[in-house]
């Protein structure tokens, strides 16, 4: 028996001071607490199984935070820490896997009112096909991989997050600014510029 937690939302890219209390709460509740309480609910049943497993689908944002994703990154980093602790607490009793995919061609950008046009093209260029992502994740689960990182962008974020934790984020911010797409507009412009 295996529990796969795959709930997640990506709030609109914007600076932290522009988030409402409701947006903050929603991101934490869906991206983190839903997994915590799902595990809490099903763990007693899973531990009675002959081959139990828990897999939390996280994000490359858990490996390195990007400007404009403060609440998403925080909730995904919390999920990473939770999953890593679970793995040690239940080592030998239950397989616990963490999956950190990069951009995937799904409708996660549905909530991004400004994701169309040039922004959508840029995201699609670095995104992994959904069917391919599923195959890679399923392979990892079948082989009980503790950590899965999939997608060119996810691997880049993993490397930069480890080797250049400060300057890596700066580099990604510079790329986001240079892309000059509406998707990231609220991240780098001040309130006066946004009003114009």
What kind of feature is each model-predicted range?
Residues 39, 75:
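Active-site helix of classical SDR
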Residues 17, 66-70:
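Active-site loop immediately N-terminal to the catalytic Tyr-X3-Lys motif
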Residues 14-16, 20-25:
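Substrate-binding pocket helix/loop in short-chain dehydrogenase/reductase
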Residues 7-11:
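Conserved NAD(P)H cofactor-binding loop of Rossmann-fold oxidoreductase domains
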Residues 44, 88-89:
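Alpha-helical segment proximal to the catalytic Tyr-Lys
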Residues 90-154:
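SDR active-site lid
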Residues 59:
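Residue(s) in the substrate-gating loop at a strand-loop-helix junction
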